Every structure is written in structure tokens, then in C-alpha cells.
């Protein structure tokens, strides 16, 4: 059975194509900076928004009528959903996918049913991967949707909820290992609070630290070679989440000695919810040595919530990709489309339209970012701007050659009177625009 009978395999047709089901910029094997586009971008389609979300929102029920979402036996529907997913991935020509445990298998009415259902579906996913060549970018566990997680998972006041979450993460990590996933993601959707009146912040932070230590220990026990990734988000669904942004996660990791074990998976829409630009969050993670992977999407600047729209700004994605290229590119991570079609985009073909357009945005952004790296005007300016720190005096300050008192004496003795120098922001914005709009 074909779930998308009206859609042929999406191919590269070039910039002059006007087909919404053809790539204008994503030429998978085209070499950029000595490496194929597909290897730079490592793009993935997510299971949850693409195949699980029914088109519901807080004010209305689902609008979609996907064949794998109809009423019926949950396991049979999960099997059909997997068939639809891999047909979609294959026709789209995307190399990776991502999932939560309960995206791919019904949770069932008991932990025993959960375990059995998930095990059966992992068997099927493994066969689909072998037959299609599609790979798993990352797996994760949904420890936020079930009512038992209303007060969190690892941060829950009930240790039995903590243990249940542990069972799910244990199962999802083992599945990710078996399916040769490149990363394992931990998103603390309800690891936070609604009110401080009933919350013990110190205790909940200690619980999270212990849980993450257990995850790290299990990674090494099973021999998982990929990255563990925390996905920062400031709020929603909770009022305040503990993994607020990359800098907050960095502090948490250092508190519990996990800074060499866990990195971050940065989502564009989460960055803006935290009051940051996507560019800022990537640059911050890179500077702190915890950059891992990307959830590619965008938010609506007029809405204060997570809209998870497909990325469509070449300017934004060029700057993001520039930072990633400068950092050496992805190691295990990639660009995962944590993006969903709009509630009024009812047709199955809309799933293709959203992904094709977004993949083209990333491909064009990669080319523009590569040009920026090859003729790195920004780095040249930064080198000049900070040149004083490469001189003997600057090097001595950084290496501990001065105390505060001797530094003050140096300033007094030499009657220092440094003057401000232009930061050339407008010039540099023009430089970036020339690369992007070539």
C-alpha cells in the first residue's frame, strides 16, 4: 500500500524549477567546502510533528485525516504509521529521522505493554532502516505527555514517577543504540515548575543531576558512541523550565560534573522564547564547548509560544550555519526538522511542501555560509578588533602576569588614556548581506 501515491521521489531540478515538489538548491551530493551537502547538513524529519500530531490545538480537535491516525488497533496503526513514515522519508530523499518512544509505539495500559509494544516496533524500524538506508539521527523518550508527568519526570516529587521515567529512558536509549542512532536527546518538557509555593528548587535540581548521571553511566555501560544532548527551553508547558538556555545548561552540567558528557540540541524557536536569537544560542554553545545538534524551525515573532514552523529565512540560517562551519561542522548532530505544517494545511502533500522548501533553505544557507567562511571578512575584522590581546601586554594580562594592584599601577605609571574604536556594525551587516543576496 502506498500512503503517498500522488507524490514521486523528490529530485533536484535547479534554481529555475517552479515545482513545489522538486529541489531548487538542495543537490545532495554537490560538494561544498570539500564535502557533500548531505554530509554537512545531516537533515532529519521528525516522527512526532509529521506523523503523530493530528492538527489539534487548545481551541479545537484535530483537522487531519491521516490514514494512520484513524480509529483501530493501536499496534496495527503503529505499523502502518511506520510504513507511511519510511515511504515519506524515501520519497523526500532525506537521510535521517528522529522519534520519541511513544511516537512509534502505543504506550499501552501498563509498563509491561509499553515495553512489549516498543520492542516490537523497534524490530520493524530496524527492518525499515535496512531496506531504505534511512538512518536515525536521534531517539528520545516522551516523559511529558502522560498525566503521571504533570509535575515532571526526573524532577517529580514522587520517586516512583522518577523510576517510571527511568524505565522509558532506559528503553529509548537501548533502542537508539540498536538502531545505530547518532545521538540521544533529553528534553525536560515538564522539568520545571508552575509555582514556587509548592516547589523545592534545590531538591528538584539534585534529582535532575542524579538522573543525568544515571543516563551517562548507562551510555557507557551499553557502549553508545553518540552524543547525549539536553534540549534547552525556557518555558512551555511549565511556567519555568530548568534547562532555560544553553548557558543555564552549561552551569547545570558543571555543577554535577557532566560538562564532558552532555552537549546541547538547540532549537531555533526555543532560543527566541528565551529572549535570544538562534545565532546567539549556537555561538554561545560553541564558545562553551557544548554544541551538539540543531532542531531547525522558527517561531512567529508576534506569538509568545512554540509555533514550530518550518525554517524559511536564509539570512537566519546562513548565520547559524556559518557558526557551525566555523566550529568544524556537525560531529554526530544534524539539522532535525522539529517543524509542523499549519492546522489548515490538511493534505498529505503539504507535508512534502513544508520539508522540500525547508531543505532548500538550508542548502542555500549552507552555500552562502561556505562563501562567508572562504572569504571570512567577519573573522578578519574580529582579529583586528582584538589584536591588542595578542600583543605582549595583553598576553601577560591573560596569563596571570598581573594582579589587580599591579594592573592598576601599570595604568597609573603609563598614564593610560585608551580611546573607543568603531565597532563597524553597519559595515559588517552590509558584508553579510552581500554574501547572502549574491
Swiss-Prot record:
Cofactor: Mg(2+)
Keyword Metal-binding: yes
Subcellular location: Cytoplasm
Keyword set includes Flavoprotein: no
Catalytic activity: alpha-D-xylose = alpha-D-xylulofuranose
GO cellular component: cytoplasm
Molecular function, one GO term: magnesium ion binding
InterPro entries: Xyl_isomerase-like_sf, Xylose_isom_bac, Xylose_isomerase
Residues given in the record as Mg(2+) 2 binding sites: 267, 270, 306, 308
Quaternary assembly: Homotetramer.
Name of this chain's protein: Xylose isomerase
UniProt source species: Pseudomonas syringae pv. tomato (strain ATCC BAA-871 / DC3000)
Gene expressing this chain: xylA
Amino acid at each position: 500500500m502506498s500512503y503517498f501515491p500522488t507524490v514521486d521521489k523528490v529530485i533536484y531540478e535547479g534554481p529555475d524549477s517552479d515545482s513545489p515538489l522538486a529541489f531548487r538548491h538542495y543537490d545532495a551530493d554537490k560538494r561544498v567546502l570539500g564535502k557533500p551537502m548531505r554530509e554537512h547538513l545531516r537533515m532529519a524529519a521528525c516522527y512526532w510533528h509529521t506523523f503523530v500530531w493530528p492538527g489539534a490545538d487548545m481551541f479545537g480537535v484535530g483537522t487531519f485525516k491521516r490514514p494512520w491516525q484513524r480509529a483501530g488497533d493501536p499496534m496495527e496503526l503503529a505499523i502502518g504509521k511506520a510504513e507511511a513514515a519510511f515511504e515519506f522519508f524515501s520519497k523526500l530523499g532525506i537521510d535521517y529521522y528522529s522519534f520519541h518512544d511513544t511516537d512509534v509505539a502505543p504506550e499501552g495500559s501498563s509498563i509491561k505493554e509499553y515495553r512489549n509494544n516498543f520492542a516490537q516496533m523497534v524490530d520493524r524500524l530496524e527492518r525499515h532502516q535496512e531496506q531504505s538506508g534511512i538512518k536515525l539521527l536521534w531517539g528520545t523518550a516522551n516523559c511529558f505527555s502522560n498525566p503521571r508527568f504533570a509535575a515532571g519526570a526526573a524532577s517529580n516529587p514522587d520517586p516512583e514517577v522518577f523510576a517510571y521515567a527511568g524505565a522509558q529512558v532506559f528503553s529509548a536509549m537501548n533502542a537508539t543504540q540498536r538502531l545505530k542512532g547518532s545521538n540521544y536527546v533529553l528534553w525536560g518538557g515538564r522539568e520545571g515548575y508552575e509555582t514556587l509555593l509548592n516547589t523545592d528548587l534545590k531538591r528538584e535540581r539534585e534529582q535532575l543531576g542524579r538522573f543525568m548521571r544515571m543516563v551517562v553511566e548507562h551510555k557507557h555501560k551499553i557502549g553508545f558512541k553518540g552524543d547525549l544532548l539536553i534540549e534547552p527551553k525556557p518555558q512551555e508547558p511549565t511556567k519555568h523550565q530548568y534547562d532555560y538556555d544553553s548557558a543555564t545548561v552549561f552551569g547545570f552540567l558543571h555543577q554535577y560534573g557532566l560538562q564532558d558528557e552532555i552537549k546541547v540540541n538547540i532549537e531555533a524557536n526555543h532560543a527566541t522564547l528565551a529572549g535570544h536569537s538562534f545565532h546567539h544560542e549556537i555561538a554561545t554553545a560553541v564558545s562553551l564547548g557544548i554544541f551538539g545538534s540543531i532542531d531547525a524551525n522558527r517561531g512567529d515573532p508576534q506569538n509568545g509560544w512554540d509555533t514550530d514552523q518550518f525554517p524559511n529565512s536564509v539570512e537566519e540560517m546562513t548565520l547559524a550555519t556559518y557558526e557551525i562551519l566555523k566550529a568544524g561542522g556537525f560531529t554526530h548532530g544534524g539539522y532535525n526538522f522539529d517543524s509542523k505544517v499549519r492546522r489548515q494545511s490538511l493534505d498529505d502533500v503539504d507535508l512534502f511542501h513544508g520539508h522540500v522548501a525547508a531543505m532548500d533553505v538550508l542548502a542555500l544557507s549552507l552555500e552562502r555560509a561556505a562563501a562567508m567562511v572562504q572569504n571570512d571578512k567577519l573573522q578578519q575584522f574580529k582579529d583586528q578588533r582584538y589584536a591588542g590581546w595578542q600583543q605582549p601586554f595583553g598576553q601577560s594580562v591573560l596569563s596571570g602576569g598581573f594582579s589587580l594592584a599591579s594592573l592598576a599601577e601599570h595604568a597609573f605609571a603609563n598614564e593610560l588614556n585608551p580611546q573607543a574604536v568603531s565597532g563597524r556594525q553597519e559595515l559588517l551587516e552590509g558584508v553579510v548581506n552581500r554574501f547572502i543576496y549574491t
